[in-house]
């Protein structure tokens, strides 16, 4: 904790901003502009709804800058069924790219597989007992950052809560982009290795993998610890 706070008194020359349903652009002085039925100054837009098949933009930021923290909470089921956290898909686009650098269901992005809630306590990902999902991976961008959310859920989702904490600041020339990929194999084969990641080229750091495993036969509920070979260059 002391290491984390050791430079808190230093001004880094950056502008901290936050995007929420209360301030969808993150602009200075634009938070809490909408009013609820309780009147001006009350929360009038604390969350957003999402129709089946709809895509909304959660964040649209002109750079350079760094996303430092993402917080989300969503329902885990609706009247139309469960698997809401698997049916909501996040996509991140850096610097006007056409193909997203991140494409992953919300639950799996926050280490909650199979659309089920789970408590996670780690440095980059933290999911609280009440369903608040946090990501602390820093994500730099030079020109532009865009994050979208698409619903593949069959029913209406009443609320999506989210916050993007970011900073407008210079980004070093050698800064790398954040990437995340979701992969699913419906049934593995005995004696055949499961490929976690393949076809990646360039320079970078592999920061880890979250895996959710399920046995289809009750007699095979024990999943032993496998070896994890890495093939580089």
What spans do the regions from the language model cover?
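Noncatalytic modules at the cell exterior or secretory-pathway interfaces
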Residues: 68-69, 139-152, 207-209
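Short beta-strand/loop motifs in extracellular/secreted proteins, especially
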Residues: 88-90, 145, 160
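Beta-sandwich interaction modules
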Residues: 113-144
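Single conserved hydrophobic/aromatic residue that forms the stacking wall/gate
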Residues: 221-233
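Short, surface-exposed beta-strand/strand-loop-strand elements in extracellular ectodomains
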Residues: 83, 87-94, 224
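Terminal beta-strand-rich extracellular "head" domains
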Residues: 100-106
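Solvent-exposed, flexible loop/coil segments flanking beta-strands in beta-rich domains
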Residues: 1-84, 155-220
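Short edge-strand/loop segments of extracellular domains
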Residues: 91-99, 167-169
């Amino acid at each position: 904790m002391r290491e984390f706070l050791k430079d808190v008194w230093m001004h880094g020359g950056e502008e901290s901003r936050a995007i929420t349903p209360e301030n969808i652009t993150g602009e200075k002085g634009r938070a809490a502009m909408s009013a609820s039925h309780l009147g001006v100054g009350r929360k009038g837009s604390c969350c957003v709804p999402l129709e089946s098949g709809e895509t909304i933009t959660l964040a649209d930021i002109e750079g350079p800058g760094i996303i430092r923290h993402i917080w989300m909470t969503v329902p885990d089921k609706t009247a139309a069924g469960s698997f809401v956290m698997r049916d909501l898909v996040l996509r991140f686009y850096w610097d006007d790219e056409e193909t997203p650098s991140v494409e992953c269901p919300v639950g799996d992005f926050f280490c909650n597989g199979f659309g089920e809630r789970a408590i996670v306590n780690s440095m980059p990902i933290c999911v609280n007992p009440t369903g608040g999902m946090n990501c602390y991976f820093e994500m730099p961008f030079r020109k532009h950052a865009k994050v979208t959310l698409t619903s593949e859920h069959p029913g209406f989702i009443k609320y999506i809560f989210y916050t993007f904490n970011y900073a407008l600041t210079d980004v070093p020339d050698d800064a790398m982009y954040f990437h995340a990929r979701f992969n699913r194999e419906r049934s593995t084969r005995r004696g055949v290795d499961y490929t976690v990641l393949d076809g990646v080229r360039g320079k970078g750091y592999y920061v880890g993998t979250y895996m959710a495993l399920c046995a289809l036969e009750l007699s095979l509920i024990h999943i032993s610890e496998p070896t994890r070979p890495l093939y580089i260059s």
